[in-house]
From Swiss-Prot:
Substrate binds at residues 6, 9, 40-44, 65, 84. Its EC number is 4.6.1.18. The lineage of its organism: Eukaryota, Metazoa, Chordata, Craniata, Vertebrata. PROSITE patterns: RNASE_PANCREATIC. Keywords: Disulfide bond, Endonuclease, Hydrolase, Lyase, Nuclease, Secreted. Monomer. Interacts with and forms tight 1:1 complexes with RNH1. Dimerization of two such complexes may occur. Interaction with RNH1 inhibits this protein. Endonuclease that catalyzes the cleavage of RNA on the 3' side of pyrimidine nucleotides. Acts on single-stranded and double-stranded RNA. This is Ribonuclease pancreatic.
Length: 122
């Protein structure tokens, strides 16, 4: 799996325009293989066409949380869903809280301007 493919698996959900129910994160985190071996504590899904997300790599250049300079911030707010592991949940029964948001996203890009890491939303 390339970094770009991993980004697609972990963060892209073009089939839904928003999280359909409060159970969305529980289903999607499992379906996208983020509950194998451990519960990924936090993850964001983006409900926009791939072309829209790829285009962020040509938008505002910002510094990533880790200090690298290959992050880019979207010009507009995008439809995203934030999944946060609930305090009571323990592996292998990973449970998540689902939040629908409209926020600008910050992604790290590599090579031919392809998103490879979700850094933050603002």
């Amino acid at each position: 799996e390339t970094p770009a493919e991993k980004f697609q698996r972990q963060h892209m959900d073009t089939e839904h325009s928003t999280a359909s129910s409060s159970n969305y994160c529980n289903l999607m985190m499992k379906a996208r293989d983020m509950t194998s071996g451990r519960c990924k504590p936090l993850n964001t899904f983006i409900h926009e066409p791939k072309s829209v997300v790829d285009a962020v790599c040509h938008q505002e250049n910002v510094t990533c949380k880790n200090g690298r300079t290959n992050c880019y911030k979207s010009n507009s707010r995008l439809s995203i869903t934030n999944c946060r592991q609930t305090g009571a949940s323990k592996y292998p029964n990973c449970q998540y809280e689902t939040s629908n948001l409209n926020k600008q996203i910050i992604v790290a890009c590599e090579g031919q301007y392809v998103p490879v890491h979700f850094d933050a939303y603002v």
